[in-house]
């Protein structure tokens, strides 16, 4: 399949960093912001397929690339993580003047961002945000981290760790005094990586603290816009705690779909 044609725009952040956002723009006053998963980008097949579908149906699209995910190292020590909603907020503010309706769609880590952003009192939500969809989301990061340690997920974890480790070597060259790269030798799981690197460079105490504060599950009761979460029952990345049934039953705005099949982000065809 031919790749979707995006027009790239660079947004400068308040902390002197940048975000590369890939747009498909048409005359529509409706835009969908797409948020990718761990170690993904606007090149990810599920982002490409979704962008293509939305564009064919008359929506403009803004596909985020988180810090250090657009093929270029970011300027600051901080990178992206499951709770980094301030960068999503920056993208929303960037598109706000040009559109009447904004929709947020997030996959996996990106879905956690979308849910957390909508339920976090840190942000006053624009009335232009109309609805949200989150797909294959580890709403309980600790539970998901335990699921990822299961033997059937070894290959997935290894693939993530391989690219994350490469990034840390580059970060070490950029900030030699801020990163103890020797800790990489101790990293055997994603939890280890979050303990030694993700948490430390992003202002958390350790993986436990990061998972506690960044998990979106605690923010779901505060969601005020129509929001759909689709988590497949056969998703190997999700623990039982990643299916917020009670929260959905008690909310007027949050809806949960739990199809039997779909795996992890397996609903999206290749387009």
Q: Model-flagged regions — what are they?
A:
Residues 1-25, 268-270:
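N-terminal cap/lid segment of alpha/beta-hydrolase-fold proteins
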Residues 29-37:
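Short beta-strand element of the alpha/beta-hydrolase
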Residues 40-43, 51-75:
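Conserved alpha/beta-hydrolase
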Residues 67-103:
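Catalytic nucleophile-loop/oxyanion-hole region of alpha/beta-hydrolase
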Residues 103-202:
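Alpha/beta-hydrolase-fold enzymes
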Residues 196-219, 225:
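Active-site nucleophile elbow and catalytic-triad environment of alpha/beta-hydrolase enzymes
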Residues 223, 229-231:
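Short beta-strand/loop motif that positions the catalytic acidic residue
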Residues 249-266:
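Catalytic histidine neighborhood in serine/cysteine hydrolases
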